From Swiss-Prot:
GO terms for biological process: diaminopimelate biosynthetic process; L-arginine biosynthetic process; lysine biosynthetic process via diaminopimelate. Belongs to the peptidase M20A family. DapE subfamily. Zn(2+) 2 binds at D128, E163, H377. Zn(2+) 1 binds at H95, D128, E191. It comes from the Bacteria. Its EC number is 3.5.1.18. The keyword Metal-binding applies. This is Succinyl-diaminopimelate desuccinylase.
Length: 406
């Protein structure tokens, strides 16, 4: 059996629904520590929502350290003493947590029992994103077996809180790394980015997300006596029409234009003869680098104020947009994908948010690359079994290119 497949099956068999890691990271530590990774477990969150995070790092070797180690008299010196000269660091990032399974009766096989049918590997987390993690680990194992003293540092940043609130996971680790001056250069997040075939799309950025909860104040009353009431739905309707029609920006070469969408509207008591006293609207901006949270807030507030109704508004900034323009990391990933699959990958910033938004604050080059995403979060989630080792080879190819070995 493929070593990548074997590790993937071990991870899938662990029921790691957010925030429960279910022993996945212990399994990773058991593979990484013998390779020379210094592994650090960071537990965060309240007692009822304990999150497990892993930071594991292998210190690379500068050319001078490699030359020194080639001398017989130097062999006894600890590797850490000879790897102090800084080399670039590549981080593999991901999450061991998965979304809930949904109705078990609708699965063809148990979601936490890896199974194979018609060339596909089934189980919760196969696509999102346990096969990516398995491929990353085996790629590093093979890379270090061939190049035990690479001119590249490597790290893993793994959390069990990506599918949940995301406040005790990757962001906590990034804050700690920033506080102690850890320098990161490149990061690959193992999100399932491929669309029709492995490697046909990678994410070199993501839009920001800004949400709001708007409460419009009216006066409740009898529907037959509207002059004695103030209908908040009617008050808000013209503003809603204007907000929907507003073009917030034009987008740019890397991002589509900023989008404003309403997700929920609630008003009324449920009775058909009562004018509601208030209206609650949940909305969200998915915004590109042409806009800022402040500019979007100011423009929306100006529209609301123009329509002269009483309201309260609470904002939640879920993440800023990030972008990695073509350069060292993008070129390495493109080259590795082309060499393994023959596919010319497409750069994209579409889709939802990911933990890349936190990592981008401390790492200048972040991309996302993983398996086909057609079944993520679905009943009978699966990936092509034959894609696992090619994904591993792509990750290994990136390592070789960043280390100057390809």
């Amino acid at each position: 059996m493929s070593r990548t497949l074997h590790l993937a099956e071990q991870l899938i068999s662990r029921p790691s629904v957010t925030p429960d890691d279910a022993g996945c990271q212990a399994l990773l530590i058991a593979r990484l520590a013998p390779l020379g990774f210094k592994c650090e477990t960071i537990v965060s969150g309240p007692e009822h929502f304990r999150v497990t995070n892993l930071w594991a790092k292998f210190e690379g070797f500068s050319p001078s350290a490699q030359a020194a180690l080639a001398q017989p008299a130097i062999e006894s010196i600890a590797n850490t003493e000879l790897s102090q000269a800084k080399v670039k660091t590549l981080v593999f990032a991901g999450h061991t947590d998965v979304v809930p399974t949904g109705p078990l009766a609708q699965w063809h096989s148990h979601p936490f029992t890896p199974s194979h049918r018609a060339g596909k590997l089934y189980g919760r987390g196969t696509a999102d994103m346990k096969t990516s993690i398995a491929a990353m680990v085996v790629a590093v194992e093979e890379f270090l077996a061939a190049h035990p003293r690479p001119a590249l540092s490597m790290a893993f940043l793994i959390t069990s809180d990506e599918e949940g609130p995301g406040i005790d996971g990757t962001v906590v680790v990034c804050d700690r790394l920033l506080a102690r001056g850890e320098v990161l250069d490149y990061c690959i997040v193992g999100e399932p980015t491929s669309v029709k075939q492995l490697g046909d799309m990678i994410k070199n950025g993501r839009r920001g997300t800004l949400s709001g909860k708007l409460s419009v104040k009216g006066v409740q009353g009898h529907i037959a006596y509207p002059h004695l009431a103030k209908n908040p739905i009617h008050l808000f309707a013209p503003a809603l029409a204007e907000l929907v029609a507003t073009q917030w920006d034009q987008g740019n070469d890397f991002f589509p234009a900023t989008s404003w969408q309403v997700s929920n509207i609630h008003a009324g008591t449920g009775a058909s003869n009562v004018i509601p006293g208030d209206l609650v609207v949940d909305f969200n901006f998915r915004f590109c680098t042409e806009s800022t949270p402040e500019s979007l807030q100011q423009r929306l507030l100006a529209i609301l104020s123009k329509h002269q109704f009483e309201y309260e508004l609470k904002w939640t900034l879920g993440g800023l947009p990030f972008l990695t323009t073509p350069g060292t990391l993008v070129d390495a990933v493109r080259g590795a994908i082309l060499a393994e699959t023959g596919v010319q990958t497409e750069l994209s910033t579409t889709g939802g948010t990911s933990d890349g938004r936190f990592i981008a604050k401390i790492c200048p080059q972040v991309i996302e690359l993983g398996p086909v995403n057609a079944t993520i979060h679905q009943i009978n989630e699966c990936v092509d079994t034959a894609s696992l080792d090619p994904l591993k080879n792509i990750y290994k190819g990136v390592l070789e290119r960043l280390a100057g070995l390809a």
